[in-house]
Amino acid sequence: MPQRNNLRWPQACMAGAILLSGIAWAEAQAANSPQTSILELGKELQVGDVVFIRIPKPPFTKVADTTSSWTNHVGIVSDISGKEPVIAESRVPVSGETSWSKFVQRSDNGRVAVTRLPVPLDKQQQSKLRAAVAARRGIIYDTGFDLHSKWQFCSRYVREVLDEAAGVKLGEVENFSTLLKHNPQADQTFWKVWYFGNIPWQRETVTPASLLQDGRMRVVFDGQAD
């Protein structure tokens, strides 16, 4: 099974078809979501908070559609000691850390959600989290979304970092067969193109949606920040 490791022309050819639905989605969200400023929301963040956004381009929009969720990207707060919080994430092309404002500004129409463990991370757990982040810095983004590959993708990254810091494995591990069975509306044509005509049905993965839906976390904010 070939691994996807770069965004190539088949994905780009589908961008136009996805754009219109993305615009409609953004307009609907603007009318229905709580609003705050990026600055004010940033003041509330704690190390270990999990932050969800929506990147408005494929394949990420298709990830959201396939999981029946608005979110398609996730990061974790790794530092709050500077001028603004820092978000650790697995991103294209390699994993790293991003300022809070830049992270949220990448989201479609400023859509963002923040979830938190019931008990804040203690100093030892925060130190473990930063060590887990450092160990994953510079790892290539896995566009094959394989939970067991040598690379990383966003939800796997956050799941592993929080597990190493606090012993909490967020989200539900699913194979592609189960995931698409639970979401029959998913565009299988897109995924067949994405995987060169052969969807890896038994491949295990974990999605941003399953991390957001994890009942062990409490929602700190779910709306728009600008």
Question: What is the predicted function of each stretch?
Answer:
Residues 1-3, 18, 93:
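Intrinsically disordered, low-complexity regions enriched in Ser/Pro/Gly/Gln/His and often acidic
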Residues 2-14:
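Bacterial N-terminal signal peptides that target proteins for export
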Residues 12-22:
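Bacterial N-terminal signal peptides
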Residues 24-226:
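Cysteine-nucleophile amide-bond enzymes
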